[in-house]
């Protein structure tokens, strides 16, 4: 049973799940808004908000910490220098999730996740 389990498995192995969240986070940073499944969006929210909180500091160590998760120089630079400073006075709640529609093939709920 999954009682009080800390995260969703998303039907993937741990390495696949880690790669999925990393790629979704990079896409969100590059485009500021993406559409994905509702449960992926909810997991991504936790992942990206932790990174944004670290990136708000804006120093060298923040760059290193964010890069360790994203492994993408452009996305790291954009998060630390452009996106995170906008939230300097905000304690969490950097993203918004809105349910949009149902996927035509399997009728799963889709949602958009975007920076506020």
Swiss-Prot record:
BP GO terms, sorted: translation
UniProtKB keywords: Ribonucleoprotein, Ribosomal protein
Coiled coil stretches, renumbered: none
GO molecular function: structural constituent of ribosome
GO cellular component: cytosolic large ribosomal subunit
Pfam families: Ribosomal_L17
Gene3D superfamilies assigned: Ribosomal protein L17 (3.90.1030.10)
Subunit comment: Part of the 50S ribosomal subunit. Contacts protein L32.
Protein family per UniProt: Belongs to the bacterial ribosomal protein bL17 family.
PANTHER family according to UniProt: LARGE RIBOSOMAL SUBUNIT PROTEIN BL17M, RIBOSOMAL PROTEIN L17
Protein name as annotated: Large ribosomal subunit protein bL17
Naturally occurring in which organism (per UniProt): Helicobacter pylori (strain J99 / ATCC 700824)
Taxonomic lineage of the native organism: Bacteria, Pseudomonadati, Campylobacterota, Epsilonproteobacteria, Campylobacterales
């Amino acid at each position: 049973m999954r009682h009080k389990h800390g995260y969703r498995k998303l039907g993937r192995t741990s390495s696949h799940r880690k790669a999925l969240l990393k790629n979704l986070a990079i896409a969100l940073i590059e485009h500021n808004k993406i559409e994905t499944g509702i449960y992926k969006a909810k997991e991504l929210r936790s992942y990206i908000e932790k990174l944004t909180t670290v990136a708000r500091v804006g120093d060298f160590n923040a760059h290193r910490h964010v890069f360790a998760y994203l492994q993408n120089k452009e996305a790291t630079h954009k998060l630390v220098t452009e996106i995170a400073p906008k939230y300097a006075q905000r304690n969490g709640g950097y993203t918004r999730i809105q349910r949009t529609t149902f996927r035509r093939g399997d009728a799963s709920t889709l949602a958009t996740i975007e920076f506020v």
